Amino acid sequence: MPKPAFIFTPLEDSHVQAAVICANKLKIHFRVRSGGHDYEGLSFVSLIEQPFMIIDLAKLRAIQVDIAHNTAWIEVGATLGEVYYRISEKSPVHAFPAGVCPSVGVGGHITGGGYGSLHRKYGLAADNVIDARIVDANGNILDRKAMGEDLF
């Protein structure tokens, strides 16, 4: 199974944007890795017999919890355990309806729906996302307003 030609670890979202734009211009396939919990190996191997790169988002892991507004801004490389810990630092009663494995990356967990033990009462983790900043396939950085209400 082909391995990546290189691994790119961005420190901010503009670095992700640059990586996507460069990959498109150079016609290099890429995989995105958030936490690495991937039973199929889709984030670190490729069935395409061409060089590819991994955009590893593990260094994008800032978490800002705002208890007054019942919100948090979580970067994609943070793990669920880090999110739970940051919430617990601010409140003994707040939670986030997500999975039970603390080492799962937030990005992969939410894009997979975000199943967890609280989802029957509070919905999936993805149901609780009210805004996001994403880099699309063309390298554009989009937020909720730019993506439109179809995504949310």
Language-model regions, residue ranges each:
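Short, basic, glycine/proline-bearing loop/turn elements
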Residues: 1-9, 135
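FAD-binding core of FAD-dependent oxidoreductases
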Residues: 14-152
